[in-house]
Each structure stands twice: as C-alpha cells, then as structure tokens.
Amino acid sequence: MSAVGNILSMIKSLSAAEKRELKMMLLENASATMSDMESFMTDERFAGGMVCPHCGCLHVVRNGHQESNGKQRYLCRDCGKSFDITSNSIVSGTHKGLDVWERYIACMMQGLSLRKTAEICEIHRNTAFNWRHKILDALQDIEDNVVLNGIVEADETFFAISYKGNHSNGGSFTMPRKPHKRGKEIHTRGLSKEQVCVACAVNRSGKSIGKVSNLGRISTKNVDGVLGDRIDENSTLVTDEMNAYVKFALNRGINLVQVKGGKSKKGIYNVQRVNSYHSSLSKFMRGFNGVATKYLNGYLAWHNFMKYSKHTDAERKQLLLRRVLTLPKKVVCKEISNRDALAFAV
C-alpha cells in the first residue's frame, strides 16, 4: 500500500473529534505563498496579455511597484489609469495577500463559521463577514448566467422576512412594522407580505436557479423576473397548479405541464426534484442562524454552487479561485452593510 493509502486508512480509524482537529490543522497549513497566488492571479486574469481592467484596452506598460507591498503596477496609455493585478476585482483594496484569500475560500468550502474562519485566516470578524459577501456577490453574477433546458421543475419556497443587520445603519433605517419577539413565530395567516418568496427551478441534469422574487404570493410578473430568459424555449416546464406559470409559459412559448395538487406525478413528469431542492435549501439555511433578507440572494447562489453543481470539493475551490477572485467586479465594504433592507421591488 502507498504512503497516501496508509494515511487514508489511519484517518478512517480516527474519532469524529480527531478528524475535526486534523481538518483544522490541514486548513491552517494548506495556503499557498503570496508570490504563488500573485502568479496564479496574473495567469488566470491576464492569460492573453495585460489588459486594462478599467477600459479593456491593451496599450499597457509597467509603472513601478507599490511601496506598501511591492506589487507591480501598470499604466494604461489609453485611459491614463494605473492598476495592479487585483484592480477592479473583489480582492481590490483588501490589504491582504492573495494567499489569505485562498485560505479563506478553503474555510468557506468547509462551511466554517465566520468566527473560526477569522481565527484561521488571522483577520477580524468584520473582515470575514465582508469577504463572504464579496464572494457571494461575485458568485451571484456567475449563477445569474445559468440557463435550464430539458425537463425543468419549478416551484416557490418561502422565508420569513428578516431586517437583521439594518438597525445599525446610522439611524437611517426605520422598521416598517413592530419587531417580533425573539423566538416567536409570525402569526399572520396565509402568504402575507411577511413572507419572502423565492422562485426556484431545477432540471434533470442537476442545474438550478433560486432567487428572491417578491413578498407574498408569486405573480406572472414575478416568475418572469426570475425565470424569464433562463429557461430554454425548447424545454418542458413542470409546475403545480399555480396560475402564474400558465401565462408565463404562454408568453415565453414554453411547453407547460401542471401536476395537480395531491398527485405525485403526471406521466413521466413530477415536481419531486424541486421539492428536494427546497428541503436541501432549508437545511442549508438553518446552518446560518438567520440570514437578513437583503443578503438572501447571495446565500441562494452559494447553496446552488455547493449543492447543485456536479463538481468535487477540490474542483469547486478551483472554480472559486479562477472565476470569483478574477471576475471584473469591485465590491466596497461600506456598500455591503448599507444595502436596502429589501433588495428587490416589493
């Protein structure tokens, strides 16, 4: 047996506590050097040559090094702006080496708490929070390009509206209702405006869409706002008997099959996959002890990436590194906490 085989056999004999301890030790020692990550970022972001991240032009020259950290800087001869390899990305202006970001992503992949992640990455808890939402914002941009084809099942699920995190916004936030007592459930009957509707769709190859659509009962306009242009016109849409989908499918020219309430299927069609998606999403969200509604879309994208993408954990980590860190998107920390309490049209 190889050395790796011997190690794997030994790991199987460890207790649950010992396995957790080993995982923490590996995470703390698995990060690449800063120079390795800078080379990685340069290769991934500028594989075809140096391009200005501000205007996209190719007329770029070297422009010395940054005094604080020694990073190579560049100057665009067209727009006159200077930049480094991280400019106009989510890691821009974070004042941490890219090796710390790799360690952070490893913690995120393991589902570690912000407190534990901050400890391992040697950053403040507030920084860990902001980094999470920078990554989730970039992940949303990627997930928004997912288009479903084949047999697509669609249905809604609901979360209680949460104004968590809005009360400290410099007095600019006013609660639109009386606060609920801790641990008390919402007592409004039916699908009230206290319920956040999440429109969901899953196809049989495992691709998924999940996004906040509205408050209360979903309408055709709400369905189109989430699923419009994201379901191939040659697909078959399978739903329950909700009327909102009838007009949506008609307007989009999509074949619609509706399964009657109380029935598990209609021929080869059913809504079992989207129901399973709801269960998976509910379990995933419980791990965060309440998510503010203004951040909900980010967690939906995270769930889809982790649970409904056919990749190994190692492949997911590489995808996050290659696509999320290099995505041309800048997120300012102050903007994260100051987002609207309801990040969608009510």
State each model region's role.
Residues 1-346:
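Residue-level recognition of single "structural anchor" positions
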